[in-house]
Amino acid sequence: MAGRWTSLVDEAAAPWLPRGGLGSAIARHDFRRLRAVAAVSLTALPIVPLALTLALPVSAALPAGAALWASASLLAAAAAIAGGREFPTDGEVEFAPAPELPDLNAAYDLFAGLVTVHDTRGHVLSVHGRDASEYLKLMRDPHGRGFIEQIHVSDRIAFLRAIDSLRLDSERSAVDIRLERTSADGPQFAHIYCEMTPLRDAEGNLLAIVAQSRDVSEEARLQAEAAAKAAHAESANDAKTRFLAAVSHELRTPLNAILGFSDVLAGEYFGKLENDRQREYVSLIHQSGTHLLSVVNTMLDMSKIEAGRYELLLEPFRVAEAIAACEAMLSHQAREKGVRLTSRVTRSVGEINADQRAFQQILINLIGNAIKFTDRGGLVTVDAALEGNMLKLTVSDTGIGIAADKLQMLGQPFVQIQNDYTRRYEGTGLGLSLVKGLAELHGGDVSIRSAEGEGTVIVVTIPSDASGAAERQCADAPVTVEFPPRLKQHADGKREAGVPALSEALHTGEIGREGGHGAAQAKTA
C-alpha cells in the first residue's frame, strides 16, 4: 500500500520540482524525505479514526482521528526536513557549487570578433575571439559587470532582455548595442551586433551564455547617411511641391486674363478687327495661352499626385459618353493634322464607377499625343472593353512609334523621347506621367507596346467598380502654400474666363483665378 501511495505522490509532485539550478538538489532531497512521510501518513489515514472508535463514540472519534492524523503528519514532515539539513555554524556561509562548463576556449579563440562567456546574470566570465585584442584596445576590462557597464544606457534593457529570452529556453538571441569606446579617436560609441547562444546541461538548465560581438559601426554610419539623404530628398520634394503649387497659382491669374481678353478681341465685342493679320495674332495669343494653361494645370495635378493629395471623386458615368466628349474636343485638332480619329466601344461597356474628370484627362492626353505624333493620313483609334471587372482602354496610332531602348524612359516627368521628329513638337513630357499617376490612383496600370516607324499602342486598365481605388490617408500635415492677397480673392468661387465673366471683371478690375476653356483642357502637355 505504501509503495502505491509513493508512486502517486511522485506523479503529482513531478511538475512542481525545479529542473535544476540554484537550490534544486536541496529541494529534491527534501522531497524524498517528505515522500516517505506522506506514504506512511496516507496509509495511516483510515486506521487512526477506526482505532479511536474503540474508546469514543463514532461521532467524536472520526473528527478527533482526522485532527490527530493531520497533526502527526505535519510534525513528521517538519522533523524529516529538519533532520536532513546541516546548518552552517557561525562564520560559515553556504554557496551553490559553480557549474562545470565544457572546455571550449580553444574553439572560442578561432571565432571572428569578440567572444565573451557570460553567466546567467550577464556577467563576463572569460574573453576570447580572434580579434579580441583589437576590441580590448577600445574598451575597458569587460570582466564581471564591466561589459554591461560599458553599454549605452539606452541599450542595456535590450541586452538584458536578450539574456532573459535565453533563460526562457530560447536557442538564440541577438541584439544591437552601442559600446562605449575609451579611445579618444573616432566616435564615442561603437555600434556592436551581439549574437548570443546558450550553454545548457543535459537536463536543459542554462549554465552560461556565449556572446559573439561584431563591430558594425561602418554599416551603421552608411545607414545613417542613407537615412539623412532620404530625409533631404523628401524635404527637397516637399519644397518642389510647394514651389509648383505657388508658381502654378501665380501663373493662372494672368493666363486667365490673357485668354479672356483674347476671346473679347476675337469676338470683336469692342470693335471690329481691321485685317486678317490682327485676327491671326489674336488667335496665336489665345492658342499660346491655352497651351500654357494646360501645362500649368498638368504640373499642378502632378504635384498633387506625387504628394498623395489628389482626391478622386468617384461617380457613375457612361464610358461611351465620356469617350465621345473627348473625341469631340480633339476632332478639330485631328482634322487640322489630317489624321482620322475613330472610337469603338463594345456593347458590354455601360457605366463604370470612377473619377470622370481623371478618366477624361487620361483620354485627352493619350489621344492628343497620338494625334501629335501621327503623320497626315494616319489613324488614331480608341477602344473600350470589359475584361471581368476591369475596363480596358486602348489608344493606338499609326504614328512614328518608339524605339525599344527608349520605352523604359516613358512615363517619367519632364522626359521626352528626342529625335528629329519630336523636336518639332512642343511639350513637357508630363502627359504620360500624369496618365500613369491617375491610373494607379484608381488601382489600375498602364502598358505600352511600340515599334519605331509602325506606331504605338497604349493600354490603360482600371477597375470598373472602383474596387481598386487607392485609399490615401495623409498622415503628414498638408502642404500649405501662402498666396499673395490678390490670389485669395476668389479662392472659393470658380469663374469661366469667357465674355460674361470678363464683363464683370472689366467693371471690378478683378479676374478669377480658376478660369479655363474646353480647348485648354484639350491641349496636352
Curated annotation (Swiss-Prot):
Membrane topology: Multi-pass membrane protein
Cross-referenced Gene3D superfamilies: 1.10.287.130, Histidine kinase-like ATPase, C-terminal domain, PAS domain
Reactions that this protein is recorded to catalyse: ATP + protein L-histidine = ADP + protein N-phospho-L-histidine
Membrane-spanning parts: 36-56, 61-81
EC number: 2.7.13.3
Residue positions, PTM Phosphohistidine: H249
MF-aspect GO terms: ATP binding; phosphorelay sensor kinase activity
Region (Disordered): 506-525
SUPFAM superfamilies in the cross-refs: ATPase domain of HSP90 chaperone/DNA topoisomerase II/histidine kinase (SSF55874), Homodimeric domain of signal transducing histidine kinase (SSF47384)
InterPro entries, sorted: HATPase_C_sf (IPR036890), His_kinase_dom (IPR005467), HisK_dim/P_dom (IPR003661), HisK_dim/P_sf (IPR036097), PAS-assoc_C (IPR000700), Sensor_HK_Regulatory (IPR050736), Sig_transdc_His_kin-like_C (IPR004358)
GO cellular component: plasma membrane
UniProt protein name: Uncharacterized sensor-like histidine kinase R01002
